Amino acid sequence: MCDGLVARAARQYSTLLYTPEHFVELLFWVEDKRFAVHPGMDPIAVMRALVFNLRQRGALQGASTIAQQLYTIRLGRSGKVCRSLVYKMKQLSWSMYASAAKSKASILDEYVSTVYWGRSYHGLDKAAEGYFNATRASLSVTQSFFLAERLAAPNRVSVRRVSNLLGRAPIKLTLTRNGATLPEIISLYERIYGCGGEMWQFLGK
């Protein structure tokens, strides 16, 4: 059911954002797959993250929806303060209020227009131009995957994380359906970060 939900949401919002459908679809799969239906927070993701954090006995982290991330972007916060219980409660409260008061399209538009993609690139237009000398409308599916993957840790690359994402069935389907190949994706990471060989090793190819 989630596959159809993400696909329908991607079709809807890509038109509003003048952005390729495959970019929006990959963004949802990587960052917030229930964006179209949750009230600003994702109860399922919160429960999974809570169980994980209790097991790890560490700071609260994970499960942040696009609306929750937008709250952090607006405040310009980062680091441990964003993982404190008090901060998380404020973030949840604001994201639910914003999701009730604003349209989902406006939340998504503000997010992609302001979020940090690394290398001093804030917003999708700057990231597309800076990394690929492209516009948001001309992004290929390989470039879209790269940008969606970058959001979690824009200042560093994790070969393990990239490989895990490439192994997820919905992401793999979106990539192959739009003509992307594994060598093409790895070549892009090699060109930008020089980690192509490590990725091939990690993937066992």
Protein language model annotation of sequence segments:
Residues 1-205:
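Juxtamembrane regions of bacterial inner-membrane/periplasmic proteins
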